[in-house]
């Protein structure tokens, strides 16, 4: 343990690297030794006889021979560590009695964190993991491949075409292929004349595919009324029901026709098993936190958590479409209701009732669910927004919105006919308010323009108290009648359920101030007509002006009047008094 310190005392002036090389000289066989001498030392392991080497254990003999033929690789790690220790001694960073401890500690740390054995073990472990994953993948692929081969062999025994519901039959087989391919821990195998599908993902479940398809053979494309579906459900065996339940997650709304019995049953299974599951760990954590905060009402807490965890999950909205039969029913209802509305002048509700009354009983019974939902939606649309109802009936390409399928009817709001429905946010913008608040006389023109463009009908005749201090032009004859002509105003839809509010609004719009009544009374009074001036009065006035010389120029009317007496050039006479020249 104290070897580095002892050697360092004997050769204090040597370089640390040279000193480390001297300290690390091996005492055994080296590459520079003679091969014959090395073999002699190996064979002469015992002093009694060279033949005694053969009597050594096999492991010892083999180890000695291997070491002599292929020497071990030299590891310079201890030499480098020894060089570092010698350098620390020369720089007096450590004492001589601490050299052995530092040397051992450095060797242990190198062996633990920077050993080639550790790196080799890590590489070997990574290789083993990769090999295990590759074997698992090959096993999984081979298992699915065998299941697909068995499934194809089973499908080859089934007919390619069915009398009814060919599209549903084809989509069902595609969903079966997808389930066999994607579901782990499942396989398809043959046992005797029958083929089986077995899965152990959530408990061991086995389905006899041969018997299930034999039971479903006569049910493809069958459309059963709502009341008779219980009778039809007795034809399904538990084996067939289990197959439908397993395939349901691999279908969508367009895979199987919804109006068929099998499509209806698969839809129920898919919606039943597709509900979001509550995370129990999250539920327990939130419950413990709420109890720590002092909220002991677990009933309201459970309701809140169930709502947050199950009803507020972001999902891709499903695509809903009508099948061919439902679209034909929709077009028939549109044509029938439009005929009752246009020809007989019936109300929307009466037109819908007459259309439903004239349907054939068997036709209505086979499509009762869809017809009831369609009539309910159209009745709501007619009651809430007549324009939307009219557009839906008269549009030959109209299709119901997604809320029609989910039952959440979101209809656009109609125009109730209130005065405040015409008010826009631009009227109360800060720019318009500041524009109206100015008091300069130069703002009269823009103010009149804003009044003319105001959406309020009553703003055209403001009280005189508001316009006090401003000069207004006199109104022309018949201007008020022209501006108040009802033909110029748009026809406003009356809101029949709110006739009281409408009458109050009409009464308030007819109220007028005393200034308005006074101005209207003055406009209705007949104005006196001024008599026309006689020609002889104008001539007399022009002659009098020419004689007195008080006017610089004659009247325009006298100048233009070329007939009669008088001096037509009176305006050319010089001003002032002129005396006699002689």
Curated annotation (Swiss-Prot):
Residues 1-114 are annotated as: Peripentonal hexon-tethering domain. Cleaved near the C-terminus by the viral protease during virion maturation to form the mature protein. The record marks 565-566 as: Cleavage. Its main location: virion. The modification Phosphothreonine is found at residue 282. Residues 146-259 are annotated as: Binding to hexon-linking protein. Residues 566-582 form a propeptide. Pfam families: Hex_IIIa. The modification Phosphotyrosine is found at residue 482. Residues 517-526 have a biased composition (Basic and acidic residues). It comes from the Viruses. Belongs to the adenoviridae hexon-linking protein IIIa family. All late proteins expressed from the major late promoter are produced by alternative splicing and alternative polyadenylation of the same gene giving rise to non-overlapping ORFs. A leader sequence is present in the N-terminus of all these mRNAs and is recognized by the viral shutoff protein to provide expression although conventional translation via ribosome scanning from the cap has been shut off in the host cell. Structural component of the virion that acts as a cement protein on the capsid exterior which mediates the interactions between the hexons, including the peripentonal hexons, and reaches all the way to the penton vertices. Two hexon linking proteins IIIa, one from each facet, stabilize the unique edge interface between a pair of facets. As the virus enters the host cell, hexon linking proteins IIIa are shed concomitant with virion acidification in the endosome. This is Pre-hexon-linking protein IIIa.
């Amino acid at each position: 343990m104290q070897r580095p310190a002892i050697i360092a005392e004997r050769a204090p002036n040597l370089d640390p690297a040279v000193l480390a090389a001297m300290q690390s000289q091996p005492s055994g066989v080296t590459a520079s030794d003679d091969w014959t001498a090395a073999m002699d030392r190996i064979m002469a392991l015992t002093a009694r006889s060279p033949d005694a080497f053969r009597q050594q254990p096999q492991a010892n003999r083999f180890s000695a021979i291997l070491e002599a033929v292929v020497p071990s690789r030299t590891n310079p790690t201890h030499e480098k560590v020894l060089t570092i220790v010698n350098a620390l001694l020369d720089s007096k960073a450590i004492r001589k009695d601490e050299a052995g401890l530092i040397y051992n500690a450095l060797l242990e740390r190198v062996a633990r964190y920077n050993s080639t054995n550790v790196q080799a073990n890590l590489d070997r472990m990574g290789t083993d993991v990769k090999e295990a994953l590759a074997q698992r993948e090959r096993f999984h692929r081979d298992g699915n491949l065998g299941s697909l081969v068995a499934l194809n062999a089973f499908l080859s025994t089934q007919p390619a075409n069915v009398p009814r519901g060919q599209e549903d039959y084809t989509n069902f087989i595609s969903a079966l292929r997808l389930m066999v391919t994607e579901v782990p821990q499942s396989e398809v195998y043959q046992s005797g004349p029958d083929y089986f599908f077995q899965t152990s993902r959530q408990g061991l479940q086995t389905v006899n595919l041969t018997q299930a398809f034999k039971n479903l053979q006569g049910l493809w494309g069958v459309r059963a009324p709502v009341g008779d579906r219980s009778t039809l459900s007795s034809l399904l065996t538990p084996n067939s029901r289990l197959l439908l339940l397993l395939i349901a997650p691999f279908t969508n709304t367009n895979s199987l026709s919804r109006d068929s019995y099998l499509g209806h049953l698969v839809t129920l299974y898919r919606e039943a098993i597709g509900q979001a599951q509550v995370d129990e760990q999250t539920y327990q954590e939130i419950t413990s936190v709420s109890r720590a905060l002092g909220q002991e009402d677990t009933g309201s807490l459970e309701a809140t958590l169930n709502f947050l965890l199950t009803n507020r999950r972001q999902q891709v909205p499903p695509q809903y479409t009508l099948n061919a039969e439902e679209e034909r029913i929709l077009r028939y209802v549109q044509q029938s209701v439009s005929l009752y509305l246009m020809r007989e002048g019936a109300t929307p509700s009466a037109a819908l009732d007459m259309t439903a009354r004239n349907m054939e009983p068997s036709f209505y019974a086979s499509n009762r669910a869809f017809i009831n939902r369609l009539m309910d939606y159209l009745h709501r649309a007619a009651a809430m927004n007549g324009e939307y109802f009219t557009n839906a009936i008269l549009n030959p390409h109209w299709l119901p919105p997604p809320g029609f399928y989910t039952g959440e009817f979101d209809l656009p709001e109609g125009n109730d006919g209130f005065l405040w429905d015409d008010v826009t946010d631009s009227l109360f913008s800060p720019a318009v308010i500041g524009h109206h608040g100015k008091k300069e006389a130069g703002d009269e023109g823009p103010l009149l323009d804003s009044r003319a463009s105001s959406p309020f009908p009553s703003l055209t005749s403001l009280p005189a108290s508001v316009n006090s201090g401003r000069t207004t032009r006199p109104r022309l004859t018949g201007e008020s009648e022209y501006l108040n002509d009802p033909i110029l105003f748009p026809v406003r839809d009356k809101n029949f359920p709110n006739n009281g509010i409408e009458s109050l609004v009409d009464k308030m719009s007819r109220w007028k101030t005393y200034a308005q009544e006074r101005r209207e009374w003055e406009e209705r009074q007949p104005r006196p007509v001024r008599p026309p001036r006689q020609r002889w009065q104008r001539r007399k006035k022009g002659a009098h002006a020419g004689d007195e010389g008080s006017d610089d120029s004659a009247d325009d009317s006298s100048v233009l009047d070329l007939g009669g007496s008088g001096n037509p050039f009176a305006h050319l006479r010089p001003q002032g008094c002129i005396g006699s020249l002689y």
